[in-house]
Amino acid sequence: EAYWGTQQRLLDLGFSFVYDKGLYDAVRYEKMADVHGQVAAALAYQKHLVRFLENHDEDRCADAFAPGRLASVATFMGTLPGMRFYQESEIEGAKIHLPVALRRVVEEPANPASVAIFEKILQATKQDIFHKGLWHLLPISSEGDDSSGNLIAYEWRLENAWKVIVVNLAGAAAQGRVSFADHPPAAQQARQYTFHDELDDARYPRSGDEIRRAGLFVRREAYQAHLFDVSSA
């Protein structure tokens, strides 16, 4: 457990993983500048962070985040590099905070909406790419307005597999253009890419020229996310 900015000190002492309390607070309270700063940290450091939406000290996820926010924050925390931590009964949407000294719990019915969201994320992140792949933060430029700062985009790559994640962590619609210029697509000569969203099964065909030249235009409503599996032809 790492609080009060002690993460690097504990890692220097030999701990393998430390809580990412800073990112949790930034996401919970929608401090987008802080979110951007946290995910821009060196990958060598981020690999040692524990990403969480609740633990035995914090409020239950179902209380801390309104139901409409769950899709974006769970996709975000569940697809970042580092350790992904899930508290007992978090997936089921439990709301009663459990003191660690208590040896019994109050039974709560599972929330089907919460279970459905987490099951999709857990199913997607079972794939090797989220454990053995290379992660990159992706730049997003403005497109038509100044809302792109509410979006976070990043990718995972492993051999020919390619995932692109875009999340809107704010309470208003946001749009922008995701650039792959710093990390060109592996299939650079592809005529077309298909972005298959593993959250809602939607498919978005895009020309290879557009992706290489201009990037990917995205628009997400408040607290929505994309978890793309990208294929090429």
Identify what each model region corresponds to:
Residues 1, 52-53, 87:
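A cross-family glycoside hydrolase active-site/sugar-binding cleft signature
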Residues 1-7:
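Aromatic-lined carbohydrate-recognition surfaces of secreted/lumenal glycan-active proteins
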Residues 8-18, 30-44, 64, 80-86, ...:
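Carbohydrate-interacting/catalytic domains
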Residues 17-25:
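A polyampholytic, Gly/Pro-enriched intrinsically disordered region
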Residues 73-77:
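Structural preference for long, well-ordered alpha-helical segments in enzyme cores
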